[in-house]
Amino acid sequence: MKQAKFIVIEGLEGAGKSTAIQTVLDTLRQAGINEIAQTREPGGTPLAEKMRALVKEEHPGEHLHDMTELLLLYAARVQLVENVIKPALHEGKWVVGDRHDLSSQAYQGGGRQIDATLMKNLRDTALGEFKPAFTLYMDIDPKVGLERARGRGELDRIEKMDISFFERTRQRYLELAKSDASIVTINAEQSIEQVANDIRSALNLWLEQLQD
């Protein structure tokens, strides 16, 4: 197998990312890849976890501005990339991430409707040429996903947004996935078994292409 790669699982709330991540880990190990680090965003370092809390939690009496939210997310992302992901890849460890930059492009760019040029410039400034080698986008109808999320318990600040926010977010996800060959869309509304099969098929095909 060639050098270590960064793989990301993306999707709306309730899309089954945790289960998808486990399928990815199992598939990688079956392919003989055992040196694997896991990350989540926002978070993944002590400082980034503090920023995660600021983004996720309610702030009674003070509105968290959309731009503040966006900058916190990118600040946390830079901490994670520079202190965890890049060092792991350098050591030969594959990295499997629960969310990455695509989340901001979809949630803040799509859901919050922040200017696309600003989003691109911020991404380029913060991350430069760094990007995942392969991304699985778990696609689900927002109404279905939110029902699943509510079943897990109390919703966080972002999960409490109205349905139109998540519809815009999903639309941006789909647009981005369509324009980038490194992003594979998985229908997350299927049975657990079929979703797992689709993930394994997509991941194994990509791994085979790395051998060429």
Swiss-Prot record:
GO terms for biological process: dTDP biosynthetic process; dTTP biosynthetic process; dUDP biosynthetic process. The lineage of its organism: Bacteria, Pseudomonadati, Pseudomonadota, Gammaproteobacteria, Vibrionales. GO terms for molecular function: ATP binding; dTMP kinase activity. Phosphorylation of dTMP to form dTDP in both de novo and salvage pathways of dTTP synthesis. This is Thymidylate kinase. ATP binds at residues 11-18. Its EC number is 2.7.4.9. It comes from Vibrio vulnificus (strain YJ016). The keyword Protein transport does not apply. Keywords: ATP-binding, Kinase, Nucleotide biosynthesis, Nucleotide-binding, Transferase. It catalyses: dTMP + ATP = dTDP + ADP. GO terms for cellular component: cytosol. Belongs to the thymidylate kinase family.
